[in-house]
Design a protein with these regions (language model features):
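Charge-dense, low-complexity intrinsically disordered segments
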Residues: 12, 42, 78, 82, ...
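Active-site-proximal loop/turn and secondary-structure-junction residues that shape catalytic pockets
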Residues: 3-5, 37-39, 68-71, 109-111, ...
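N-terminal pre-domain/capping segments
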Residues: 1-101, 250-264
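Short coil/turn linker and secondary-structure boundary residues
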Residues: 16, 46, 79, 112-115, ...
Length: 264
């Protein structure tokens, strides 16, 4: 739903446009949504149960949500997650009531030291344990900066190697991985099974730039451990984001490699 943020990205826009926009997405062939607006126990300004009902009324399912409460400098220094974990309690409850399968942390800045990165990993493990206890799974969404090094270690690699696979999966954004000058498929092979969800994304509409090898990515879903994928269109080539979304999903629906991957 981040892709259509200009139409339904806050409570006011959601109230005004959600029925039309969600139905249009469903009619294009989208089957599930990933939310990107949580606050104070609500999604897009409505109760979790109402959000679930809205999505299902359009003919789709609620799958995942981008949400986080990052550690502040004092918490990072003290390694005291008490207040942060209290915040997660309400958040987890709301997402469970909304019928979510996955909760995904969308961002973490590059820390200055490996010690700080280890603290972040420890924090994510604790949050993930809470999420798992509620019957959902916690993920981390990578951009390009995670492929930078922290004290000689690639941030993405360190996070994968120092988080518990029972409590944290990784949602690779294949476009940002390419922008970070790495191969998504190489990561699937290096860390098989850790990429439960993927963001299928391009520079604009899917398949236009030629930057991303979508055929190899879809044909290695099993190696990645992917159980689902989210089409994201951060910027369309025209002002009409829904037109761009339709062009993108049509590309995916008509691609032979996508059909082959689902016929395995």
């Amino acid at each position: 739903m981040y892709s259509v943020r200009d139409l339904i990205g806050d409570a006011g826009k959601y109230a005004q446009n959600h029925e039309r926009v969600l139905k249009q997405l469903a009619d294009m062939g989208f089957t599930a949504v990933e939310a990107a607006n949580y606050g104070d126990g609500k999604l897009y300004g409505v109760a979790p149960e109402q959000f679930k009902a809205d999505v299902e009324a359009a003919g789709m399912k609620v799958m995942s949500s981008h949400v986080t409460r990052n550690l502040n400098d004092e918490e990072l220094k003290s390694k005291d997650f008490t207040e942060a974990l209290k915040w997660w309690d309400q958040c987890i409850d709301a997402h469970k009531r909304a019928g979510m399968q996955y909760m995904v942390i969308p961002w973490c800045s590059v820390p200055k030291t490996l010690a700080d990165l280890q603290t972040i990993c420890d924090y994510y493990n604790q949050v993930g344990k809470k999420v798992a206890a509620a019957g959902m799974k916690l993920g981390y969404h990578s951009h390009s900066h995670e492929f930078q090094k922290v004290e000689g270690k690639v941030m993405e690699d360190y996070m994968i190697e120092h988080t518990d696979p029972n409590y944290l999966f990784f949602q690779m954004d294949v476009y940002w991985a390419v922008r970070g000058q790495v191969s998504p498929v190489a990561y699937f092979k290096k860390y098989p099974g850790r990429f439960t969800l993927l963001h299928i994304k391009d520079d604009s509409e899917i398949g236009q730039s030629g930057m991303v090898g979508f055929d190899a990515i879809f044909n290695n879903f099993d190696k990645a451990g992917a159980k689902g994928w989210v089409l994201e269109l951060e910027h369309a080539s025209t002002p009409d984001i829904l037109k761009g979304m339709k062009e993108s999903i049509d590309y995916i629906k008509n691609a032979k490699f996508v059909k082959a991957s689902y016929n395995k």
